[in-house]
Amino acid sequence: MPLGEWIYDEFDYMLDHVETERRLREPLQWMPVDPVPFDARCLRDAEVIVLDGSDAMAFVRRVLELHRSGDHLRGVATTVAPVLVENHWEMTVHGDTRLEMVLTPSALEVTLDHPTAARQFSEMLEEETVYVSVSEEVPMSVGIVDETVGINLTDEQGVAKGGLVTDDETVYGWAVDLFERCRERATPVTPDDSDDLEELVT
């Protein structure tokens, strides 16, 4: 390779690294785990979603859209909202999406405390394409839609700050590993548990 071409490539690489660092500096400070469990450069092409004070629901709408964009949704969640439960209910009970989720006890409790969400959740458990389990050891909220990964960004109090969406293979591998590790330690929730779900949140 000619020296000039090598210098150009190295300079271009440096500029790409600087631009990636600048664009991701704020989002990565809200990454719920520290250090970031993969090379941050894997997120150079990620979609960055930041909570907008003028449209507080924009982030939620993007999450709903992402979850609806594929045939297979896997994930781990430390928080839920009735609108997300309704979305999953429509995707599974009234659709053919395969859903596998690991929730924290507190996330399950929020679901059960909302009458409509609790009913929809119970109906989802009856579907053969739905697998839900509960574990205390879920560190953050991550969704895997087919081969796309969505990462929720939160502050130290767990308040949502935005999210990242990426198709990067390294991030996908990390997300699948996180999901599988959490599921291995989780307690399955079955239709037979529908009358005793409260026991799983204590």
Annotate each PLM feature.
Residues 1-17:
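Basic, amphipathic "hinge/linker" alpha-helix immediately C-terminal to the N-terminal HTH DNA-binding motif
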Residues 12-66, 71-74:
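Amphipathic alpha-helical dimerization/coiled-coil segments
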Residues 44, 95-97, 125-130:
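A short helix-to-beta-strand connector/capping loop
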Residues 63-119:
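Primarily the HKD phosphodiesterase
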Residues 75-79, 103-104, 134-136, 145, ...:
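Short His-Asn-centered micro-motif
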Residues 103-111, 139-140, 158-159, 165-166:
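Structured extramembrane domains adjacent to transmembrane segments
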Residues 107-141:
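HKD-type phospholipase D/PLD-like phosphodiesterase module
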Residues 142-202:
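Amphipathic alpha-helical interface segments
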